[in-house]
Each structure stands twice: as structure tokens, then as C-alpha cells.
Amino acid sequence: MRKDFGFEQRPMVDWLAPGQLTQTGIKSVISDIFGSYADKRDVMAALHPKPEIDGDYSQESELWIDYAADLGDGFDATYTVARTLAEPQLSLEHGGQTHVLPRGRLLVMGGDQVYPTASFDEYFNRLLKPYEAAFPRSPQGQEPHLYAIPGNHDWYDGLSSFTRIFCGQGWLGGWKTQQRRSYFAVKLPHNWWLWGIDIQLEGYIDKPQLDYFYRQSLDNVQANDQVILCVAEPRWVYGVTKGAEAFRSLRYFEDRHLHQLKPARLKVTLTGDLHHYVRYESKDGEVQRITAGGGGAYLFATHGMPEKLALEEGFKESVRTVEYEKKASFPDTATSKLLTFGSLLIPIRSWKFGLFLGVFYTLFSWILQSASKARPDLLAGSRSLMEYLQGQSLGNGPRVLKTFAALIVNTPVSVLLCLLIVGGFMAFCSARRKIARFVIGSGHGVAHVLLNLALMWLFAHVNTHGFGLGIDSWRQVTLFVLEMLLFGGLLGGVL
């Protein structure tokens, strides 16, 4: 980590490193357990009880808004995005024409401003200082304004750091923060509004926040005003891929505050969380739902996103089905499919993960080999599992699997290791539905156990028949350990 500028220029988070996985998992559990007892939104509402709007730009004839989400990861990516946002103007070529885009009068940060988990130290090194280096503080009166909503990574410390940075009307580089809460309402020109809501903690919207937007709808929003809504997750996608419940709280908010109180028109919903760009448009062309999580975190595939969505919008008696179609994405589908081959490099890019799997496979093999010497009755007369495997051809696959399973069941430590790896993959499975998490996670774990068996079988043949080494010789044992660490780590990392 370089410290040339008074802060650590940190690398991208290695999400697959065993230590990082453990740390993130523990903090996630702690956040889930204690988060509801440390909800800063109640405190913010008590300190600022008046439901005032956070910014009024309605008198301006033209207003440009920049948007970035999923930001504070590695220095290189974060600084690149920050420097692009700081440019006075950008010139883009499209359709044979040059379009000049001025820097936004407002910058909206759409969630997950820091990785891997929220703390002031991580914000300082991964967000504050890179943005300050890219865009130092502007002269008073000329500064662009900043608004932000928290994502799940911002919530890991109960919003303590988020509140300190974004809700004190301070500075983030050359941008001046304006809001007093983790949500905001901003009045834009030409009867438009920009609302940012906080729905991260347990997926619900707290009552003070609902009251705040209730007063905005009742007192400030006029009939047929148009609203841009910023949220931290693309719940319209999760409602299709992870169950209708994922879309429920957002449905309620939209129906209650944008349709029932006053017939305002929701025109655009902006979010991050998925690290790509995908835009869905309603069938009548009136509503855009946009995921734009390209603020610097790792790129997420787009080719698996649904081409069409049929969303149940509204709540209770006002429920209706609205159809959406995917209109644009970055990367495009072909490029996204091509980029997936980069997963083959995971054992190299995340070598700690590959090494962990190699060590796990080696340990598992050692335990089974040792246990098998006490159960020759399971090995058709062979003295050990490796001796048994080197004498089995591929045609005996079912018999080998049966023997392998019998050894595991009769070795308590092996059972515990199997439960550990299966449970680990279930815990870190990204599927929201419990049944999907169970099926995918357990299947992934079992696949690693089977890969371990296949490698033991392969190395038993290669080392004895190919190199002529005795099963119990120190040369064979040393070679086996090296093979399992190398090839187990590489193949396991890809799997």
C-alpha cells in the first residue's frame, strides 16, 4: 500500500481471500443482529424534526446531475471515477456527433460508498482522500453539491461513519454535502424532484423516514410533478430473481407517497448494488428503472439479466402489472459473456483463496488416507485408500464413490470437514431464497468434495503407474502434497 499522499492507496478488496470472507461474514452477522438496535435514522430524525427539503434548485433553468454508486474500492478505480466526475466537461462521441457534458451541479452517490465494511478508516483511505486528490475543495459559492444514500456496506457500522461524512454539511473533496439524514428530498427545475430513500436495514423503511416523505408529498409536491427516485438496490430485478418480497417495501413506498397522496409521476428509479449499467423501460415508455453501479467496484455480468420484467406495482387494492423491457446495458451481452472467461484466472488473481482450497484438499485427503488404514474391510482388501484408488479403473466409478462415501461416514472428522465446506458455500451463496441458497450452496460444496476425490484418484494413478513410486514412500507423499496444493488450488479456484 502506497502512502505518498498521506493516505493508503489500497488495492481492490480480495473478496475470496479466506481472511476477508471470515471478517465480512462476522461483521455481516453482527450488523444483522445488532443493526436494528443501533438505527441512526431515529436519531437523525430527532435532531432534525422539521421535514425540510435538503436543496431547492427549482429556479435554475438547467441542471446537470452526476450519479455514481458502488464506489470506495481500490484506489486506481476509485480515483479514475472521481477524476472523471471532477472534469469541468466531458466530450463524448455518439452517432457521429460530439456531445459536451458539463460537470454536474449535483453529485448523487447511490450506495456502497466504501468496501469491504464501513469504518471511518476505510472511508478515509478508499473514498475521502481519493476524491480529494481528484478534486480539491472549490472556492466557496462555486462548489458542486453532494447527496448520498447508504448501501448495505455503509450499514455495517450502523451508519456511524456515513452520518459523520455525509450528514454534517461538510466536504468530500470539492463537493459540499447538503443533507442531514440518510435520505433526502431535493426540488429540481421544471416541476421535477430528486428523492433518495434508505431501505437497507432489514429491507424496511423506518417510520420517521415515511413521515418525512409523507410531509413532502402532502406539503411540497404538486399533482403531476415528476420524481427521480434513488434507492440502494435494484429491487425490481430482485423481485423477479429472488422473490416478490424483495420488491415489497419499494412497492409500498411508491404507491403510498407517489400515487395515493398526490398523483405525482415516478419517471426514473436509479440504483447501484449490481456493478454494471442496465436500463429497463416500461412498455408505455413512461418509466425508466436504471442500475448504474459502475463507481469503481468489480464489474458484474449483464448477460444473465432478464430481458423482460413483469412487475406487480402498487399496494393492496391498487396492485397492477407493469411490463418492462431491457433497453441498454454495459457491458453488452456479447462482451459480458466473453468477460466471464476471466473467472479462469481467479486462482491467480485471488491466490490466497486457491491456496486455502489446496490446503483444504490436502488435509481432507490426509485424514481419509489415515482413516482408511483402520478400515481395510471397506477397501476390497487394500491397505489404504490411495492403494485402493491406484488399482481402480474409470469403469469402477460407482464403486469408488460408494467406498469414498463409506469412509467419510465412518470418519467423524471427515464429516465435519464436509459440513464445513458445504455450509460455507451455502452461507456465502448470493441467492436470496432459502431453498435456492440451500440447493446451489450445497451443490457447490459437494462439487468440491467430488473434485477432491477425483484428484486423489488421478494422483494415485499418475504417481504409482506413471512415476513408479510406492504409495507410502516419502517421494510419493511429497509429490502428492505438491500436486494437491497446486492443481487442487487451481481447479478448486475455478470451480
Question: Residue ranges of each PLM-predicted region?
Answer:
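Acidic, histidine-bearing metal-coordination/catalytic regions of metal-dependent phosphoesterases
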Residues: 1-109, 114-116, 121-150, 156-185, ...
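Conserved beta-strand segments of the P-loop GTPase G domain that flank and frequently precede/overlap
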Residues: 70, 109-110, 195-198, 230
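Extended active-site neighborhood of metal-dependent phosphoesterases/phosphodiesterases
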Residues: 118-228, 238-326
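Active-site beta-loop-alpha junctions enriched in small/polar residues
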Residues: 232-234
